[in-house]
């Protein structure tokens, strides 16, 4: 749209003024000034008048850039079931998967969903334990990472599995305290009802690229999402997905009797030795060359240079799940070797996070 505008401009006295018009204006609409024929303006102490035509052009519409995730997020469902209206499933089996001499019990449990809780690998569900709290209100839900692939342990898409450690500790007053939800779950008998919410979460979803390098760092029950990944990669057949990349699992536990799903992972390694690497860190039984306890970051330090080279690739994805303390230890390792490349690790990690290549779920 064009508009003609007349502007009166007071000019300082001058014998002769040649007035080229060059104007730049920032406004919501772009203003285009067209020069009117005017060689000079004679001024006799009076106000001169300049006529200018101003053409306004509307700004081009802004096109919204849609970010495409590198993760398997198409059609993902979140929060289908809420605490006030949970899905009520039943416990099919509940098995202790740690040895009798392990420091604490961990249980693997399977619940029915009848396909009504459409979760993905890497998501979590909420559990609302039976009973009421000290204020007479229903217990609040607790979130647990799902330990089964999207089609479940039985391959029929009708179950969901969890990996839960029973929480029991002695407080400062010398009283034995039992975690409400973990003990509720570990004590479940087959046939018992369980209230399920969710599914929730997108942080830990698997990468879309079947040729990706997937580095998994887990401690204790933080192994849950990685079991779901690895079942899909190595135990299942899908028409639209076949993993051809490298999966590298680091699992940290206190004792060998605490190694979770060890036999499953060893079978995967036998089945796909070129695609699956497995490293355990058993802190109370193993030490490194310096005599230091073998925590997950200690084990990773043995492969620091190799891991760094993998992290330079744009199709390497790191997933971390488990105890929060592991994150600082891993940062310390990377910081110690990065000066060789002149790269600031903390800044580089931010870049990886932005690219969805560094994914953390710790507690």
From Swiss-Prot:
Keyword presence, Transcription regulation: no
Names of the cofactor(s): FAD
Signal peptide: none
Keyword set, alphabetical order: Chloroplast, Electron transport, FAD, Flavoprotein, Membrane, NADP, Oxidoreductase, Photosynthesis, Plastid, Thylakoid, Transit peptide, Transport
InterPro entries, per the entry: FAD-bd_FR_type (IPR017927), Flavoprot_Pyr_Nucl_cyt_Rdtase (IPR001709), FNR (IPR015701), FNR_nucleotide-bd (IPR039261), FNR_plant_Cyanobacteria (IPR035442), OxRdtase_FAD/NAD-bd (IPR001433), Riboflavin_synthase-like_b-brl (IPR017938)
Membrane topology: Peripheral membrane protein
Pathway participation: Energy metabolism; photosynthesis
One Pfam family it belongs to: NAD_binding_1
Catalysed reaction equations from the record: 2 reduced [2Fe-2S]-[ferredoxin] + NADP(+) + H(+) = 2 oxidized [2Fe-2S]-[ferredoxin] + NADPH
FAD-binding FR-type domain span: 84-206
GO terms, biological process: photosynthesis
Residues given in the record as FAD binding sites: 142-145, 163-165, 169, 180-182, 221
Enzyme Commission number(s) from the entry: 1.18.1.2
Stretches that traverse the bilayer: none
Positions with a binding annotation for NADP(+): 145, 165, 221, 253-254, 283-284, 293, 322-323, 361
Interval spanned by the transit peptide: 1-52
Cellular-component GO terms for this entry: chloroplast stroma; chloroplast thylakoid membrane
Location in the cell: Plastid, Chloroplast stroma; Plastid, Chloroplast thylakoid membrane
Record's function text: May play a key role in regulating the relative amounts of cyclic and non-cyclic electron flow to meet the demands of the plant for ATP and reducing power.
PANTHER family, per the entry: PTHR43314
Similarity comment: family membership: Belongs to the ferredoxin--NADP reductase type 1 family.
Name under which the protein is recorded: Ferredoxin--NADP reductase, chloroplastic
Organism: Vicia faba
